[in-house]
Amino acid sequence: MKSGRGDESPLAAGGPARHVPVLREEVVAALDCKKGGFYLDATFGAGGYTRALLAEPETHVLAIDRDPEAIAAGRALEAESAGRLILAHGRFSTLADIAAAEGIPAFDGIVFDIGVSSMQLDQPERGFSFRGEGPLDMRMESRGPSAADLVNTADEQRLADIFYYFGEERASRRIARAIVTDRAHTPFTTTRQLAELIARVNPGKPGDIHPATRVFQALRIAVNEELLELVRALAAAEALLREGGRLVVVTFHSLEDRIVKQFLAARSGRGQAVSRPLPGEPALAPPTFILPGKQPVLPSPEEIAVNPRARSAKLRFGLRTAAPARGLESGLLPLATLPETSHPKSASHSKSRRR
């Protein structure tokens, strides 16, 4: 579980292991846990959803996380579970390999809680937050280029595209130009250094979100390839769910939600023509998911009052049919990657590929 996403306001909790899992009851209801079922928590985080699943009668849980600190913190819970919990380190795009290594062929339910966790935001040394002083890192695992590497080496065009497409930042060109100018004299090494530059060149208006919010989101997504990971993970989850199994996904911003919404729409047949194909035309693939109830499910005002970070959360879920899994949804790849061609100004960037 990667609980409590949204803005960076304080969380009403007593430490990392007690971070509030967003939409906890709604997630459990959507999973419709059955006695003795096998479930996958694809984003363990502080373990909130895993704890909720283990509270159900005789359930078994495989929980994974790409952050080794989250796995290390969860070992005590694993030891207390009497063999009902298995923790594994890895990206959720590789969940098929992880499940195979653990000898689990299929699941009754899979839950994703997408994005950065409160644990990561609340540790300045991880470099995710602009609220404190920390290294400009943002990696969910220690390998690969950091945010500082990206900020200090990418050209102005690429930085502007990252900020616009992954952060929906309309001042992307102005911010990118300022970064390239400043780094020629002093490389960026800390979160505060970058946040102060952004606030200087794009101060925003009173009452707006912090000026650095969208840029930090964009860098985090780029560093961790979060949207591409999500596209791959949804296809992997489809293949691992047995008939009647539930796929439940909680998102915290429009880029994630759009991918999940379009995946479930495509796999459920929503929006497809209902008429029979003409002779010679390929038949429509049978739906792999049924979408029950009204969606998305949103947090209640009461939950938002207790945990303000929940306010941007959306829950979508699907019920797996007996139809064969279709594999990677190639139509979602443009939503998860930068375009091949860029536009000269952020104000003229086309949003057509995001619709």
Curated annotation (Swiss-Prot):
- HAMAP family (UniProt xref): 16SrRNA_methyltr_H
What job does this protein perform?
A: Specifically methylates the N4 position of cytidine in position 1402 (C1402) of 16S rRNA.
**What Gene Ontology terms describe what this protein does at the molecular function level?**
rRNA (cytosine-N4-)-methyltransferase activity
Query: What name goes with this protein?
Result: Ribosomal RNA small subunit methyltransferase H
Q: Chief location of this protein?
A: cytoplasm
Task: Give positions of region: Disordered.
Answer: 332-355
Reactions catalysed, semicolon-separated, are: cytidine(1402) in 16S rRNA + S-adenosyl-L-methionine = N(4)-methylcytidine(1402) in 16S rRNA + S-adenosyl-L-homocysteine + H(+)
